[in-house]
From Swiss-Prot:
The lineage of its organism: Bacteria, Pseudomonadati, Pseudomonadota, Gammaproteobacteria, Pseudomonadales. NCBIfam families: PRK05170.1-5, PRK05170.1-6, PRK05170.2-5. This is UPF0260 protein PputGB1_4117. Pfam families: CxxCxxCC (PF03692). Belongs to the UPF0260 family.
Length: 150
């Protein structure tokens, strides 16, 4: 299928073709990838908790030290186009996952509607509903599961 040249970049480019600016813009700012996750040892399912990384702002869902996040949080996961086949653990609403699956961005995505607050207003993010990592003992994370990655 031929896609018009004036189509949005995420519809006419693969993830590997995106510029660094386009790649960053694809992030909807939901912060879900920065929530602590647990993996079921029996079936390898990934479960999201409402426990946020220590660097995640609980209201804006933005990293408080994005440029230095890998030094501050050694197990912080860097999303890159080359890892698109591993994006299944990302939420089904994630722009990176959607584009990697050949799907369009939802109407609430800031690149579609022009409003970065829609991700929060539509309750896609966990803004205002997360717990700080330092406030919950790791043994208690199971008590705070919110959904299973599909």
């Amino acid at each position: 299928m031929m896609i018009a040249e004036n189509a949005p970049f995420w519809r006419r480019k693969t993830l590997e073709q995106l510029s660094p600016q386009e790649w960053e813009a694809l992030c909807d700012g939901c912060g879900l990838c920065c929530l602590q996750k647990l993996e079921d040892e029996d079936d390898n399912s990934v479960y999201y908790t409402r426990i946020a990384c220590k660097l995640l702002d609980l209201d804006s869902c933005q990293c408080s030290d994005y440029p230095n996040r890998f030094a501050q949080v050694p197990d912080c996961i860097q999303l890159t186009p080359g890892k698109a086949d591993q994006f299944k653990w990302l939420p089904s609403t994630c722009g990176y996952r959607l584009v990697s699956e050949g799907k369009d961005l939802p109407a609430w995505h800031h690149l579609v509607c022009g409003d970065r607050q829609q991700v929060h207003e539509q309750r896609i993010s966990q803004s205002g509903r997360m717990l700080r990592e330092q406030d919950v003992h790791e043994d208690d994370w199971e008590d705070h599961l919110i959904f299973r990655a599909s």
